[in-house]
């Protein structure tokens, strides 16, 4: 049996930066100040549980923080302006781990609003990134999730529209919706394609290639990870059996009956250790050889850690 690894897979630069910021902050203030994180630092169960064991307190709102001497970290998904202002009012020291690519969307949305545009956001309802983007502008943003949403859209001025997109959606994810928007509203403007999240597109391109050369795909990632679920969807859409797993303990050995080639990928918020443990498990339980898929992309993107850390 052969294991073929997707390339790239796992951590993107924005997730690595956020996790590094939290780890460095925790080390710096250990036993001195309580470290809080608003929501999950990234959408991965292993990462969150590991930091909880080290003493990090994850909160769902700033009201839960009674210790104003603590340090609050904003997650990689970003927050609204109101949340930022609330932390300042309470006098809480904040370290912002928002992904720079998410910050870029915040700035784009504000720029469009300042130029008088009515805004449309392509994204998923209730995703923390979407909440943050909506909270970065003063006027309401209309959320579009499906083609039907585009057809049902009611706007004030069809000639004065702009759109932005959630970063964890790739060009492929948004292509049809953007095309439908442009068909209905030919004057609509939006960000350059090069502004999309490189990591989302790269991982999706890789898993599509992987699905062509294997019998089954294991996607390492958490159930609440948007990009991990999309990797799963891309495999099943190509007629390949695929499973989204938090770690090796979720594997069912019956999955491998009649399988010769197993593909493995990981969502952008899944750490390498989870893939490594999965490979070790498969080595122990199956006779396997391991290779990396041909034609993959090596990512060299790095984001700076803020000086405050």
Swiss-Prot record:
Gene Ontology BP, a term: terpenoid biosynthetic process
Top-level taxon in the UniProt lineage: Bacteria
Active site, UniProt feature: 129
Binding site residues for [4Fe-4S] cluster: 12, 99, 197
The record's free-text note on cofactor binding: Binds 1 [4Fe-4S] cluster per subunit.
This enzyme's EC code(s): 1.17.7.4
Keywords: 4Fe-4S, Iron, Iron-sulfur, Isoprene biosynthesis, Metal-binding, Oxidoreductase
Signal sequence bounds: none
Recorded metabolic or biological pathway in which this protein acts: Isoprenoid biosynthesis; dimethylallyl diphosphate biosynthesis; dimethylallyl diphosphate from (2E)-4-hydroxy-3-methylbutenyl diphosphate: step 1/1; Isoprenoid biosynthesis; isopentenyl diphosphate biosynthesis via DXP pathway; isopentenyl diphosphate from 1-deoxy-D-xylulose 5-phosphate: step 6/6
Enzyme class per UniProt: oxidoreductase
Molecular function in Gene Ontology: 4 iron, 4 sulfur cluster binding; 4-hydroxy-3-methylbut-2-enyl diphosphate reductase activity; metal ion binding
Classification via CDD domains: lytB_ispH (cd13944)
Positions annotated to bind dimethylallyl diphosphate: 43, 77, 127, 225-227, 269
Cofactor(s) it depends on: [4Fe-4S] cluster
Binding-site positions, isopentenyl diphosphate: 43, 77, 127, 225-227, 269
Catalytic activity, reaction form: isopentenyl diphosphate + 2 oxidized [2Fe-2S]-[ferredoxin] + H2O = (2E)-4-hydroxy-3-methylbut-2-enyl diphosphate + 2 reduced [2Fe-2S]-[ferredoxin] + 2 H(+); dimethylallyl diphosphate + 2 oxidized [2Fe-2S]-[ferredoxin] + H2O = (2E)-4-hydroxy-3-methylbut-2-enyl diphosphate + 2 reduced [2Fe-2S]-[ferredoxin] + 2 H(+)
One Pfam family per UniProt: LYTB
Residues annotated for (2E)-4-hydroxy-3-methylbut-2-enyl diphosphate binding in this entry: 43, 77, 127, 167, 225-227, 269
Function: Catalyzes the conversion of 1-hydroxy-2-methyl-2-(E)-butenyl 4-diphosphate (HMBPP) into a mixture of isopentenyl diphosphate (IPP) and dimethylallyl diphosphate (DMAPP). Acts in the terminal step of the DOXP/MEP pathway for isoprenoid precursor biosynthesis.
Family: Belongs to the IspH family.
Stored PANTHER family: 4-HYDROXY-3-METHYLBUT-2-ENYL DIPHOSPHATE REDUCTASE
Name of the protein: 4-hydroxy-3-methylbut-2-enyl diphosphate reductase
Organism (species): Wolbachia pipientis wMel
Designated gene of the protein: ispH
